Curated annotation (Swiss-Prot):
Higher taxonomy: Bacteria, Pseudomonadati, Pseudomonadota, Gammaproteobacteria, Lysobacterales
GO cellular component: large ribosomal subunit
Protein name: Large ribosomal subunit protein bL32
BP GO annotations: translation
A molecular function (GO) term: structural constituent of ribosome
PANTHER family attached to this UniProt entry: 50S RIBOSOMAL PROTEIN L32, LARGE RIBOSOMAL SUBUNIT PROTEIN BL32
Source organism: Xylella fastidiosa (strain Temecula1 / ATCC 700964)
InterPro entries on file: Ribosomal_bL32, Ribosomal_bL32_bact, Ribosomal_zn-bd
Keywords: Ribonucleoprotein, Ribosomal protein
Pfam families: Ribosomal_L32p
Annotated stretches, region: Disordered: 1-23
């Protein structure tokens, strides 16, 4: 098993962890549908930058 050569100080440990913070995802509103979506991603309706790029099939609702 690997063993460190010298003890890591709290300062060094903090410097290493400084880039580990999580950031919130960037959200946008589609100009056509008004739907909230992740930036640079297609909306659930199939719109990207105000244009329909994917034809989405209508969801099937089954009744018992």
């Amino acid at each position: 098993m690997a063993v460190q050569k010298s003890r890591v100080t709290p300062s060094r440990r903090g410097q290493r962890r400084s880039h580990d913070a999580l950031a919130a995802k960037k959200l946008s509103i589609d100009p056509t549908s008004g739907e909230v979506h992740i930036r640079h991603h297609v909306t659930a309706d199939g719109y990207y930058r105000g244009k329909k790029v994917i034809a989405i099939k209508a969801s099937v609702v089954e009744e018992d």
